[in-house]
Amino acid sequence: MTYTELVAAIKSYTENDYSTTDINTFIKNAEQRIHNTVQLPDLRKNVTGTMTSGNKYFSLPSDWLSTFSIAVINSDNEYTYLLNKDVNFVRESFPDTDSGFYGKPEYYGIFDDTTMILGPTPDANYSAELHYYYYPQTIVTAGNTWLGDNFD
């Protein structure tokens, strides 16, 4: 289903000629509700990055919706998956005041919508792989989307 077909279907169903702004708001809200409720396998991505020595924060991709998993990768290409914990647990368990408490991260917490906090704070640079659910581009700006093409 394309954007044009969706707008026509909304107008037909509601028997009303809403403005483009109102219809776009309706569509974006519906898309967001679906993406926040249902974890669709086709809406998963993975990225690699580096956990930086002495930095307890790890940046999330701009299209990040939620984390599926995050792992530290060692030089032998072995993965160690981090456990998700509350931010307060990470802060209290791994105080960032003494580098003697630094080590290979074992836990993460979602600090805000752009950052996760790691515990313990990395004592070296570590390769990491993040698997996550993402917000796809809205049909309002893309014209069509995975959700629109697979709505049946």
Each predicted region: which residue ranges?
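Glycine-enriched, solvent-exposed interface loops adjoining structured elements
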Residues: 1-152
